[in-house]
Amino acid sequence: MSNVVDISTWINTFLKALQKTFGDRVWFVGLQGSYSRGEATETSDIDMVVILDELSAKDVEAYNRMLNTLSHRELICGFLSGKDELLKWEPADLFQFYYDTKPIQGSLDELLPLLDVTAIVRAIKISVCNIYHGCVHNMLYEKSEDILRGLYKSASFVVQTIAFWQTGNYIHLQKDLLPVVASDERQIVDTFLTLKNGGAVDFENMSEALFAWSQNWIARTNCMYVKE
């Protein structure tokens, strides 16, 4: 018998608690991650996005108290912010945030003017730089299979952004990227899916492949042209 959370019932309880705590101050509520994609398992986090009209430290404390009243508290995570901060956020960070968030209450469409080609290319570059650093650091120091799995997960999100930049379409499920992206990106996604499904880690070869891929994209993002 599956112990995956009945997310619809849980969200209804969450929304009632949120309304009781913050009333009409709630500007947006959304769901991210595996529950939003229909891929949740028993250990999946419940990634809730809550944007208030404004956010204070006291609001953070109130939200924490509210979460403590809910079931599956250990699985709850996500994003809490004030509206003004979100609208002034680094645009490169907002690309994945916008497209990975399933709206429940309100809309994030005010973010769309910020998500231009410059923001998308910058999102790719920042991410591959971080993956490059993480990969080298892990090859030298931690030598951790779990870290490598996490880096491939991050890389699969970058491939989503690359696919959007190339096609104009956001593909939510990684498996649906496979017939769309180029062979280098396909290898990254295929490795991620293999690891996600419990496949064995070939630490040296997988690390070298990820290193080379991120290195290549650092160079490519340095000379990307804006597409018409």
PLM features per residue range, with description:
Residues 1-21, 37-43, 49-91:
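Metal-dependent nucleotidyltransferase catalytic core
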Residues 13, 17, 96, 209-216:
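Alpha-helical elements of Rossmann-like donor-binding domains used by nucleotide-donor carbohydrate transfer enzymes
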Residues 26-35:
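Short gly/ser-rich loop at a beta-strand->alpha-helix junction or flexible surface loop bordering the NTP-binding
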Residues 27, 76, 186-187:
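Secondary-structure boundary/capping residues
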Residues 52, 58, 105-115:
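Short, polar/flexible loop-turn hinges at active-site or ligand-entry regions and domain interfaces
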Residues 96-104:
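Compact structured core domains
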